[in-house]
């Protein structure tokens, strides 16, 4: 029977089997920490039961996906919810398979238990079966077409970064979807990394301007001129022709803004950024046309093997 004493801190036991382990304190000076501990323990137990059921459902759905896509590969056994309810151990989820690992997402990588999502880290990174085991590769169509490792690109762009070119910071985890052979959208997990520091940006395999803008590497502003008609010549200033105004003395290589000789001052000049993209004759316009103006990757996704993590 549950305790009915009003002075009792524990009014209901945590579990019917644990009644004999719960002492009843009839003292009014008993601190209220035990009540909060009881609620926290109940919430923790409920959360672990939900996680166990969720993990079992995910394992069953993953098994169903494997039965559909790869009938010859019976990848994972049925997960026991009682065993899944206790996962403080590191190797609990690693149900071994000759090719993949549940903790690393396996071939399909979907669905992912909420417990692993909350835990995060590199234990459930995409295993990248398309690439070598020790290869960090860019994620998605532009990465799989070239088969070019990110580390090789970083090493090749040492001279462009000049600072923090080798800084790789993990920013968390994310999901990407791709279509399977059946036309079903399949989600895969991946790690999101920051390449380079906050100063000079790492420039990797500079694409064309359209491709860079499609990949989100260029800002969403019009790269093409607003009007293709020839521009009217701006009026000359009324002060003096000897002034340093950019339109004071027209030249054959006339530019809207003076192009400084220092490349860093040209690249990192936020005041004239949008206007210089519309000036076709400036070096900035040619850089943007070739995809070199803003084609840096501040946060690009690529697969990271479990034994090659940078932390």
UniProtKB/Swiss-Prot annotation:
Biased composition (Polar residues): 1-12
Top-level taxon of the source organism: Viruses
Biased composition (Basic and acidic residues): 35-44
Positions of region (Disordered): 1-44, 205-268
Membership in a protein family: Belongs to the HHV-5 HKLF1 family.
Name of this protein: Uncharacterized protein HKLF1
Annotated organism of origin: Human cytomegalovirus (strain AD169) (HHV-5)
């Amino acid at each position: 029977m549950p305790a009915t004493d009003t002075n009792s801190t524990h009014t209901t036991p945590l579990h019917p089997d644990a009644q004999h382990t719960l002492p009843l304190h009839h003292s009014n000076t008993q601190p209220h920490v035990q009540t909060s501990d009881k609620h926290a323990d109940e919430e923790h137990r409920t959360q672990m039961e939900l996680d166990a059921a969720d993990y079992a459902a995910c394992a069953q759905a993953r098994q169903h996906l494997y039965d559909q896509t790869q009938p010859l590969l019976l990848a994972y056994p049925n997960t026991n919810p009682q065993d899944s309810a206790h996962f403080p151990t590191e190797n609990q989820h690693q149900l071994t398979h000759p090719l993949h690992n549940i903790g690393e997402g396996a071939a399909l990588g979907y669905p992912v238990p909420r417990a692993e999502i909350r835990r995060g880290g590199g234990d459930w990174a995409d295993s990248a079966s398309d690439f070598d085991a020790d290869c960090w590769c860019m994620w998605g169509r532009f990465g799989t077409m070239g088969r070019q490792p990110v580390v090789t690109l970083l090493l090749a762009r040492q001279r462009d970064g000049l600072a923090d070119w080798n800084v790789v910071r993990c920013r968390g985890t994310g999901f990407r979807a791709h279509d399977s052979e059946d036309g079903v959208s399949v989600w895969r997990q991946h790690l999101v990394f920051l390449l380079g520091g906050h100063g000079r940006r790492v420039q990797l395999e500079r694409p064309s301007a359209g491709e860079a803008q499609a990949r989100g590497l260029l800002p969403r502003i019009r790269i093409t001129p607003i009007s293709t008609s020839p521009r009217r010549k701006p009026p000359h200033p009324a002060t003096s022709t000897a002034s340093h105004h950019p339109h004071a003395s027209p030249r054959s290589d006339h530019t809207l803004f003076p192009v400084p000789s220092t490349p860093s001052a040209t690249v990192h000049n936020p005041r004239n950024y949008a206007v210089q993209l519309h000036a076709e004759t400036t070096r900035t316009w040619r850089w943007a046309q070739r995809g070199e103006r803003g084609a840096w990757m501040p946060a690009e996704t690529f697969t990271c093997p479990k034994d090659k993590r940078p932390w």
